[in-house]
């Protein structure tokens, strides 16, 4: 199966230019292709995964991937289908983000062998180009009429109170020149990107043909949608980042576990390197079992291992199991740090707090009266163990102090997992 056929079978092709010619070229020879990543934050998020993994799929098929980080274009920001003008970031901020994203992209690709990946930065050429060169050598090849007819531009112009600045209007010229430059430097003949990049990609194809007299191609990947119509890649806490310091491996693992049955088999095709035959077998087995599908677990394991590694996957599984177990002794200090980052609602507490106060503080009870009822009915657990009276000498005017949180409840001297009922948790972080 060719790489194009594999992408088609996974539903990963939204649009292409001359797919027959591209498929024939890929079958005849090994090519160089690229995808651009603008630094709009200090980390990539799961919305970037399809193009990143597509580069990897092409490399596994023997082709040379080029990961282009937009040190120059990131200073402006892509206006495509954005409702309003982007805020401009300082050169120092963008430079820091460029380095972070370069480091994140590196593990996905191999930089050794005959088709070793290439890391590029468009600041290397735009940083040396002056305004007159830009207008003479690039600008003259672009029709303003054609640019105004782009859907992404028309939406901005037609939106009341929005409009588009010349800075953002000129973005497609910069991205278009990236293709021509990478074609000249590295022989790149294919640009891939998200479906919102189609206009920019075709602009680059046309410019490369004009400047270099070369036939090149474009391929876009689909917009990832969920069956319920909500946006993919967002949680109540915001974006799901690939940086473990912004989204913990535990929370990352949980995100994939919660994928709906209606989406999970599509996402296995989109995001994993399991074969179509393996995915079809998983789906058939799930449908025949009549029990909870295994697909979500497989997806969560594959994705967490791919992004964070085997050790992080094991930690995510250990945390997931321990939260609902009586014995939480297997949790490490690093596990608690993940929970404090984004795994559980975290609350700072001080010595002397009792269980009733902790339940109300964390929102696990709406009142002291309700909290006492939970404690009396043995519905409250501390680190997996039932909360019990441990302070017989408490003051008569403070009856709730009969059940105090003490040093013995502090894991690593800092953390206590408070649980009410089967599924309601909070993390107490001791000052």
UniProtKB/Swiss-Prot annotation:
Record's catalysed reaction(s): tRNA(Tyr) + L-tyrosine + ATP = L-tyrosyl-tRNA(Tyr) + AMP + diphosphate + H(+)
Residues annotated as binding ATP: 234
Binding site for L-tyrosine: 34, 171, 175
Locations listed in the record: Cytoplasm
Motif ('KMSKS' region) on chain: 231-235
SUPFAM superfamilies (UniProt xref): Alpha-L RNA-binding motif, Nucleotidylyl transferase
EC number(s) reported in the record: 6.1.1.1
Enzyme's top EC category: ligase
Cellular component terms (Gene Ontology): cytosol
Keywords of this entry: Aminoacyl-tRNA synthetase, ATP-binding, Cytoplasm, Ligase, Nucleotide-binding, Protein biosynthesis, RNA-binding
Gene3D superfamilies per record: HUPs, RNA-binding S4 domain, Tyrosyl-Transfer RNA Synthetase
Highest taxon above the source species: Bacteria
Domain S4 RNA-binding: 353-422
Motif ('HIGH' region): 39-48
A biological-process GO annotation: tyrosyl-tRNA aminoacylation
Major site of localization recorded for this protein: cytoplasm
Molecular function GO labels: ATP binding; RNA binding; tyrosine-tRNA ligase activity
Subunit description: Homodimer.
NCBIfam families given in the database record: tyrS (TIGR00234)
Function as written in the Swiss-Prot or TrEMBL entry: Catalyzes the attachment of tyrosine to tRNA(Tyr) in a two-step reaction: tyrosine is first activated by ATP to form Tyr-AMP and then transferred to the acceptor end of tRNA(Tyr).
Protein's recorded name: Tyrosine--tRNA ligase
Species of provenance: Neisseria meningitidis serogroup A / serotype 4A (strain DSM 15465 / Z2491)
